[in-house]
Swiss-Prot record:
GO CC, any one term: plasma membrane
Alphabetic keyword roster: ATP synthesis, Cell membrane, CF(1), Hydrogen ion transport, Ion transport, Membrane, Transport
Family: Belongs to the ATPase gamma chain family.
Protein function: Produces ATP from ADP in the presence of a proton gradient across the membrane. The gamma chain is believed to be important in regulating ATPase activity and the flow of protons through the CF(0) complex.
Subunit and partners: F-type ATPases have 2 components, CF(1) - the catalytic core - and CF(0) - the membrane proton channel. CF(1) has five subunits: alpha(3), beta(3), gamma(1), delta(1), epsilon(1). CF(0) has three main subunits: a, b and c.
GO BP: proton motive force-driven plasma membrane ATP synthesis
Localization, UniProt: Cell membrane
UniProt lineage: Bacteria, Bacillati, Bacillota, Bacilli, Lactobacillales
A GO MF label: proton-transporting ATP synthase activity, rotational mechanism
Segments passing through the bilayer: none
Keyword Cell membrane among UniProt keywords: yes
PROSITE patterns on file: ATPASE_GAMMA
Protein name per Swiss-Prot or TrEMBL: ATP synthase gamma chain
Length: 293
């Protein structure tokens, strides 16, 4: 059945409206991405300073043959904790699918029995996905802002660290998409606890020798190490949000480009149908005139 000219015109108008919406959403995502990238950059400055301070402290700590902090010491792994970061909604391309696919593969390979891991979810997509497959998150956070403050995520971070300290699990990982650029992200599963990426050998020897402490190193580490773990988890959340905004921008750009192609194809279809209708009318007029002669 041939499509009428009015139907094609309505489809063109509808697609143009959709294109305007996706284009506006793309611009909003681009603005969010710029702010997220700035927040991530500022966090890296802070994190590098905290890391340097800790490596310097740990260098002296090691030199004094003192016992390492529990947050630095591995223990037999009976249960593993995961913080899984997804978005609250769709319209972000393959952003969520990448993380959730990796989680299913990880569960199948390392936790086939299903009773030796716990999941904490940031983002409704991940939480709903887990529940649909019979995995109950021990904690979930929804409605996170595009540039989340630490106060927004403090509860879930503190919950994860508290569970580790109470030995409800023996290691903690964060699963998220790392932002590379506006077109690319990398799925990462990074160990947060016990802390394994602080190397005392990277310490500044001159700084360490001249370091004067009012409290003991143990007391300072008791304060700094949990804060460092908190900051690393928070950094992963900022990174994931940046990747989410980039994915949203790219998805809306793709949708806008696709809409333009659909409009172009429909316009060609409309012109052909209109030309056929005009040709048919001319043919009928000529035939009618011939019949009157």
């Amino acid at each position: 059945m041939a499509v009428s000219l009015n139907d094609i015109k309505n489809k063109i108008a509808s697609t143009k409206n959709t294109s305007q919406i996706t284009n506006a959403m793309q611009m909003v995502s681009a603005a969010k991405l710029g702010k997220s990238e700035e927040a991530a950059k500022n966090f890296q400055i802070y994190a590098s300073k905290v890391r340097k301070l800790l490596t310097d402290l740990l260098h002296g700590h090691e030199a004094e043959n003192a016992k390492y902090h529990p947050m630095l010491t591995s223990r037999p792994v009976k249960k593993t904790g995961y913080i899984v970061i997804t978005s609250d909604r769709g319209l972000v391309g393959g952003y969520n699918a990448t993380i959730l696919k990796a989680m299913m593969e990880l569960k199948a390979e390392y936790h086939p029995m299903g009773d030796d891991f716990e999941i904490l979810c940031i983002g409704g997509v991940g939480a709903d996905f887990c529940r649909a497959r019979g995995v109950q998150p021990v904690y979930e956070l929804r409605g996170l802002a595009d540039q989340p403050s630490f106060d927004e995520v403090r509860k879930i971070i503190n919950k994860a660290i508290e569970m580790y300290q109470n030995e409800l699990f023996d290691e903690l990982y964060v699963c998220y998409n790392h932002h590379v650029n506006s077109l690319t992200s990398q799925m990462r599963i990074e160990q947060m606890l016990p802390i394994i990426d602080l190397d005392p050998n990277e310490a500044d020897e001159d700084y360490t020798v001249n370091l004067e402490l009012e409290s003991s190193r143990e007391a300072i580490l008791d304060q700094l190490l949990p804060q460092f773990a908190e900051s690393m988890i928070y950094g992963a959340i900022i990174d994931a949000k940046t990747a989410e905004n980039a994915a949203g921008m790219t998805a809306m750009q793709t949708a806008t480009d696709n809409a333009k192609k659909v409009i172009s194809d429909l316009t060609i279809q409309y012109n052909r149908a209109r030309q056929a209708a005009i040709t048919q009318e001319i043919t009928e007029i000529v035939a009618g005139a011939s019949a009157l002669e």
